[in-house]
């Protein structure tokens, strides 16, 4: 594998331009460019519930959550890395996992990420994730969450539902938003296994 990582490193350190290589294991487009002002505005906007649902997008923060999303095939739109996170092993691993995915990879200034991030000690990695379309309920086992207002409790319940093999969760109107960044972190990847219906 050393040759593969050397090629990946060459891509990372190359000038900001679209690259496409067919002779190595990462066969996706890797867009190495700085985040635009519009990117940053969009990131900030997705920390508000109304904007998440208007765009059907939500935020993932941290290496493990983003890795879990990629492994499970959950649709990602953009991944933002600080230079330090790109240089780290987990950053290179995430780049290698983008095999066969058309995900835009952009750099972001760590100070800007710190201002945007919902966590005090972020890992320098943030992604925009697409919400699944809400399908009709077919699963016989359904969890209904009624007026669960605490984001941590909501995330724990989603995680528990996924662990017990429940695939459909219906969430009442006055409950915490299941796509709130705190809920997403607390759920620890449960979103990628569940059909979540709101309101």
Name each model feature, range by range.
Residues 105-120:
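Glycine/small-residue-rich loop that forms an oxyanion/phosphate-binding "nest" at active or ligand-binding sites
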Residues 4-5, 20:
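Aromatic (phenylalanine/tyrosine) cluster motif
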Residues 32, 106-109, 195-199:
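Short acidic-hydrophobic, aromatic-tinged amphipathic segments that line or gate anion-handling sites
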